[in-house]
A protein has these predicted regions:
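Helix N-cap/coil-helix junction residues
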Residues: 21-22, 38-39, 57
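Phosphopantetheinylated carrier protein domains
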Residues: 44-66
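Thiotemplate assembly-line natural product biosynthesis machinery
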Residues: 2-25, 79-80
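C-terminal structural segments of small proteins and small subunits
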Residues: 71-77
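Glycine-rich loop motifs involved in handling phospho/adenylate chemistry
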Residues: 28-40, 61-69
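Hydrophobic recognition helices of helix-based DNA-binding modules
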Residues: 55, 77-80
């Protein structure tokens, strides 16, 4: 079953809270991982690994740099789920 964008965003919010201490209420599609949510590069690697496991997708290293916002990640995961 394919997850809805909201389910993916909620899952990412849980991951961001666990990995980087981001409040789930602060996670929105238009939020930048680095600028708005203060996720550093090391934490981003952990977020990607957790998202791959949670959603059963592979996010190539060269694709990670294109995932600038939560919405970018949601779109990628939904397209590749």
């Amino acid at each position: 079953m394919t997850a809805t964008p909201q389910e993916i965003q909620d899952g990412l919010a849980e991951i961001l809270e666990e990995v980087a201490g981001v409040k789930t209420d602060d996670v929105a599609a238009d939020k930048s991982f680095t600028e708005d949510l203060d996720v550093d590069s090391l934490s981003m690697v952990e977020v990607v690994v957790a998202a791959e496991e949670k959603f059963g997708v592979k996010i190539p290293d060269d694709e990670v740099q294109n995932l600038k916002t939560v919405g970018d990640a949601v779109s990628f995961i939904q397209k590749n789920n």
